Amino acid sequence: MTQNTVIVNGVAMASRPSQPTHVNVHIHQESALTQLLKAGGSLKKFLFHPGDTVPSTARIGYEQLALGVTQILLGVVSCVLGVCLSLGPWTVLSASGCAFWAGSVVIAAGAGAIVHEKHPGKLAGYISSLLTLAGFATAMAAVVLCVNSFIWQTEPFLYIDTVCDRSDPVFPTTGYRWMRRSQENQWQKEECRAYMQMLRKLFTAIRALFLAVCVLKVIVSLVSLGVGLRNLCGQSSQPLNEEGSEKRLLGENSVPPSPSREQTSTAIVL
């Protein structure tokens, strides 16, 4: 350790010995898992929170357009399945006509979403959201009716065991008995019943397909409603963002006060 000497007013004064300087260097290396999580967070921020607002608005518009087209297609498929159900035996599902009114409301909701994407605005957004909400409600009602049809009306073909039987006349004659014996081999009961079983399975498959379409309508309506609400919230917050950006630009362009001016003003006040 060295001792320094300081001369004050011609008098030598000894200062305290200087202490040795210690430099602590800490090297910290992050683990690979931490770096991977940071990279995933950066990717998520890039995908879901892009820096530019124009691509985000365009992406929301494409999502609305795709969801609207999907809703229209699901509504058309629902109406087609409703026609197939009406051609089958009587059921509560076919008598309610839920395939037609649920499909029509979903088609209207899809058309509203497309119109809102082409002509954005608050009024169009509110109308599109209301139509989408109505489509969601009707799709849920159709799902409930379809599930009840599967639970409570499991066998719509009540006459399947007797439809393949030939009816006998009240007073059979001798000629009829002879005809029946000769044509009995031509009438194939087993084949008739096999066809009826195929028809039963086909009708059950149509009902199951209609249930799947209704579930898809519920999901698509929920997603479309979420996208529409997000678009409305983005439109309402856009003026606030523009005002904040203008304030930031004005703050950056303002000239900061110089220290000389501050000192001059202070001297004048004193």
Curated annotation (Swiss-Prot):
The chain crosses the membrane at residues 65-85, 95-115, 127-147, 209-229. This is Transmembrane protein 176B. Residues 260-270 have a biased composition (Polar residues). It is found in: Nucleus membrane. GO terms for biological process: animal organ morphogenesis; dendritic cell differentiation; negative regulation of dendritic cell differentiation. One of its GO terms (cellular component) is nuclear membrane. May play a role in the process of maturation of dendritic cells. Required for the development of cerebellar granule cells. It comes from Homo sapiens (Human).
